[in-house]
Curated annotation (Swiss-Prot):
Pathway membership: Protein modification; eIF5A hypusination
GO CC annotation, single: cytosol
Function: Catalyzes the hydroxylation of the N(6)-(4-aminobutyl)-L-lysine intermediate produced by deoxyhypusine synthase/DHPS on a critical lysine of the eukaryotic translation initiation factor 5A/eIF-5A. This is the second step of the post-translational modification of that lysine into an unusual amino acid residue named hypusine. Hypusination is unique to mature eIF-5A factor and is essential for its function.
Gene: DOHH
Binding-site residues for Fe cation 2, renumbered to this chain: H89, E90, H207
Record text on cofactor binding: Binds 2 Fe(2+) ions per subunit.
Name this polypeptide is given: Deoxyhypusine hydroxylase
BP GO annotations: peptidyl-lysine modification to peptidyl-hypusine
């Protein structure tokens, strides 16, 4: 049983800008796992931080928790044009993930936002909510625990899924469905098909490909992920996801790519490499759990 005092102690780590970013991320993911109003309140407090990377992760976690009590905060973040595009995008995606139709109108309103990543995100979230209404709830559980911005396509043939993924004339929602079906299929052929998506036109799409390759953790995608991370002309949101994917895949070539960009002039890339190197250590070490805020707290001397 977790006490209110323990939740507060983990929350204090999250909102403390003097704490190392890795410790704050671990605290965030611990709060996400614990859930409840206390965790939501602490996560919501951190949206005035100056790290876009952290704030985007806050929104992601609130969406994954699927707790409607987070909706007002996420709507505020989506509407706040002072927030970075990657933060507003993640708030829009989180509203879709929670799955409550009460946000349909606000998502439709922001589907024509001047920031293309925000507009495309809200369009996808509207399609997801409409799909949930048409199909009577969430898609059947797959091999991954994440709440995705689109349900996987029913098609199982990797070649046909690759074709759908890369066809830029198709609706983004259909291409996302192909993306998640490829992730669920797994294996080298699917990983290589997904990696081709890192060259498609939409930055939002490319960033989601990076995220999915991090979930898949197949080393066949490492060269393409490392190349995208190294492209200084690439959207920072895409480079960030590629960095975190390399941290999750955790092969020696990933380490070299992450270390090469640990001092990148783009803050969100630099911080992503910092977090990814921490993930790399976790993946290659003996620690059982990445979201270890509670274990750290209980193991600390009183």
């Amino acid at each position: 049983m977790v006490t209110e005092q323990e939740v507060d102690a983990i929350g204090q780590t999250l909102v403390d800008p003097k704490q190392p970013l890795q410790a704050r991320f671990r605290a965030l993911f611990t709060l996400r796992g614990l859930g409840g109003p206390g965790a939501i309140a602490w996560i919501s407090q951190a949206f005035d931080d100056d790290s876009a990377l952290l704030k985007h992760e806050l929104a992601y976690c609130l969406g994954q928790m699927q707790d409607a009590r987070a909706i007002p905060m996420l709507v505020d973040v989506l509407q706040d044009t002072r927030q970075e595009p990657m933060v507003r995008h993640e708030a829009g995606e989180a509203l879709g993930a929670i799955g409550d139709p009460e946000v349909l109108e606000i998502l439709k309103q922001y589907s024509s936002d001047p920031v293309i990543e925000v507009a495309e995100t809200c369009q996808l979230a509207v399609r997801r909510l409409e799909w949930l209404q048409q199909h009577g709830g969430e898609p059947a559980a797959g091999p991954y625990l994440s709440v995705d911005p689109a349900p996987p396509a029913e098609e199982r043939d990797v070649g046909r899924l690759r074709e759908a993924l890369l066809d830029e004339s198709r609706p983004l929602f259909e291409r996302y469905r192909a993306m998640f079906a490829l992730r669920n299929a797994g294996g080298e052929e699917a990983a290589l098909a997904l990696a081709e998506g890192l060259h498609c036109g939409s930055a939002l799409f490319r960033h989601e490909v990076g995220y999915v390759l991090g979930q898949l953790q197949h080393e066949a995608a490492v060269p393409q992920l490392a190349a995208a991370l190294a492209r200084c002309t690439e959207n920072p949101m895409v480079r960030h996801e590629c960095a975190e994917a390399l941290g999750a895949i955790a092969r020696p070539a990933c380490l070299a790519a992450l270390q090469a960009h640990a001092d990148d002039p783009e803050r969100v890339v630099r911080e992503s490499c910092e977090v990814a190197l921490d993930m790399y250590e976790h993946e290659t070490g003996r620690a059982f759990q990445y979201a270890d805020g509670l274990e750290q707290l209980r193991g600390a001397p009183s």
